[in-house]
């Protein structure tokens, strides 16, 4: 299965020993920043899943003469879209706090709130994309698919931040030996 394959790759190919944490990084902000970041990504993952379910349900509902499926047990597309939006409303302030907590921690550790580290830049890109989604959904009347596609792009940025930036970029967030 894909999960077992990824776990196997993580253990054999992608694994690196973590180096000793620099003394300047030992702070209460480590626990706060990492915990809130992890929780906010979990909430964004739920929102992403709901967005995918919405797109599938919307397609099924617009298909004439479709056969019954397990999707009939889920709410209608409009309800799924509203739920997707509601979960993003919870996730976005958490991500905002993640970025702010990281900036406070960076100021303590390196003397600057912002250092143009690849992880910082992608965290800001994520924030901008989700802000655009929430703004478009709330004020410009973008409903349904148009808005959900922006949210899905935001989750794509999260994947880039954790899968690409962590593996291929070196910066202040690179702590492996």
PLM region descriptions:
Residues 26-30:
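Membrane-interface segments at the starts/ends of alpha-helical transmembrane spans
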């Amino acid at each position: 299965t894909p999960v077992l394959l990824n776990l196997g790759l993580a253990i054999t190919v992608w694994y690196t020993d973590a180096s000793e944490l620099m003394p300047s990084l030992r702070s209460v902000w480590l626990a706060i920043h990492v915990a809130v970041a992890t929780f906010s990504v979990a909430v964004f993952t739920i929102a992403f899943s709901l967005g995918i379910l919405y797109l599938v349900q919307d397609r099924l509902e617009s298909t004439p003469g479709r056969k019954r499926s397990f999707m009939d047990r889920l709410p209608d597309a409009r309800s799924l879209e509203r739920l997707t939006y509601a979960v993003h409303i919870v996730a976005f302030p958490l991500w905002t706090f993640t970025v702010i907590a990281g900036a406070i921690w960076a100021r303590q550790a390196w003397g600057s709130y912002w250092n143009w580290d690849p992880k910082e830049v992608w965290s800001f890109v994520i924030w901008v994309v989700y802000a655009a989604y929430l703004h478009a959904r709330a004020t410009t009347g973008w409903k349904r698919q148009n808005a959900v596609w922006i949210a899905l792009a935001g989750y794509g940025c999260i994947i880039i931040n954790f899968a690409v930036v962590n593996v291929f970029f070196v910066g202040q967030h690179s702590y492996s030996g």
